Amino acid sequence: MIQSPPGSGKSVVISEITKLATEKGGRVLFLVHRKELIDQITNSFKVHGVPLNQVELLTVGKAKNRLSVLRKPTLIITDEGHHGKAATYQKIYEFYADVPRLGFTATPWRMSGDGFKDTYDYMIEGKTVEWLINNKRLAPYQYYSLPSIDISKLRIKNGDYSNQSIDDALGKTIFGDVVQEYVKHANGQKAILYAHSVEASQSFAKEFQEAGIKAVHVDAKTPKNERDKLMLDFRNGRIKVLCNVDLISEGFDVPDCTVTILCRPTKSLVLFLQQSMRSMRYQHRKTAIIIDNVMNWHAHGLPDTHHDWKDYFEGGWKKKGQKNIVQAKQCPDCSAMWPLSQKMCNLCGHDFSIEEKHEKLRLEAELELIEKEKVKLKILSEKKFGSDLKKNWEIAQARAKVNKGNPLMKLLYFYAKSDWASASIEEIAEVTGKSNYQISQAKEWLQSKGIY
C-alpha cells in the first residue's frame, strides 16, 4: 500500500509505475470503485505515454464479473486502495492470488479500526501535508469554523451520522448562514460544497441562487451529458458554487477552485480529508479557504494535522484507544472524573454548567478563524498522562489553557492518584520552573482536600 495525501500527484506516480510495468511486457489490471474516475486516469495514462492496449482499466464490479475472460495481469493496481477490504475487491485478489498488487490511498484508515495487513504486506508513507505545503506542492489554507450545528443531536447509523439526525442537528437557519459566510470570506471564488443529502444540496444551491450567486446541484443521478456540461461550466467559471453529496470527493481536479464548504458532519477521516482538501490543489499565490459549518475539525483536526498512518495500516488503533474510555466527564480544574449527569465537582466546586452555557453561546457565535496552534493545543490537551514528566507538564499546561485551571494542580493531581508514576518535588521544580515552596503549598492544598 502506498500512502500519499490528497492532491499530492498520485495519478502521476501511478502512470509512471504502469508505464514501467508495460515496458517490460507486463499487463496491468487497474481497479477503480467508481466509473467517474476512469476518464481521469485514462487521460493521465495518455499524457504519460502508457500503452492502453496493455492495461485493463475497470470498475471493480465489472472486473469481478469478467474474471473468467480477462487475460491474467502481471500487476494489479487499486486506486483509492482503502476500499480494497470490500468483498468485491477480495474476490478479485483471491482469483489472482499470485499476482503482485499495489494500493494507492491518501488515507489507510477504516472506521472499524481494522488494518490492511491481510490485503497488503507493507505500507510506504509519502510526504506529509505540511511538507507538501512548505514545498509548494499543495496550497496553504485558511480554516474557518461556523458552529451552526447542535452536535448533541447527531446519531450514528451504519458507521456514520444518519441523514435524519444531521437534519435535526443543522436546523433551518444553516442554509442562509452558509451563503452569508461564503460572501463574507470568499465572495466570487469557485467553491465546492459538500452536503449530507440530495435534498440539502439542492436547498443550498437554491439559497445561493436567490442571493444572486450562480450555483448548481449535481449528484450521481444527474445524466452524464448534463453533469459533464456542469463540470465544464464550473471549470470555466460560469458556475461559482458546485453543490453535491459525495460525487466530488475522489479524483476531481480543478486547480483554481479555492474554496471548500463543509456542510456534512462525518466520523470518517477518509471523507473529511478528501473533502476538506479539495480546494488545496497548488497554484502560484493561491490560498485555499475551508469553511467548516459542521465542526468536523473537532473530530479530525486540520488538513495538516499529523496522523500515525502506520498504526492505522496495522490496525487495532480503535480498540487501543477505547480500552480506557469511560462515559464520564473530567473536571478542568482538578482533573476529577464524574458521571455525565454531574452538575458540580464535589472536590473543588467547579460548575460544569458554565461549559454547557458556553457551548450554547458558541453555537450561536460568529464564524471564527481557527488558528493551527489552537488545534494542536486541543489535541495535546486530550492526550493521557504517562511516565515522562516533561511530557506530562506539557499536557497539564495544554489542559489548563484549553479548559482553564492551574496546570501545576493538574500535574500534581495526576501523580497523587497514580499508583505507577511518581516524581519528586525537586524533579517537578526543575521541569516546571516552580519553586519548591510553590509545589509544597499546592500539595498541602490537595492534602487538605483528602487527595494526597
UniProtKB/Swiss-Prot annotation:
Residues 177-333 form the Helicase C-terminal domain. InterPro entries: Helicase/UvrB_N (IPR006935), Helicase_ATP-bd (IPR014001), Helicase_C-like (IPR001650), Helicase_Restrict-Modif_Enz (IPR050742), P-loop_NTPase (IPR027417). SMART domains: HELICc. One of its GO terms (molecular function) is DNA binding. Gene3D superfamilies: P-loop containing nucleotide triphosphate hydrolases (3.40.50.300). May play a role in either regulating bacteriophages replication or specifying expression of its own genes. This is 51.5 kDa protein. It comes from Lactococcus phage (isolate 7-9) (Lactococcus bacteriophage isolate 7-9).
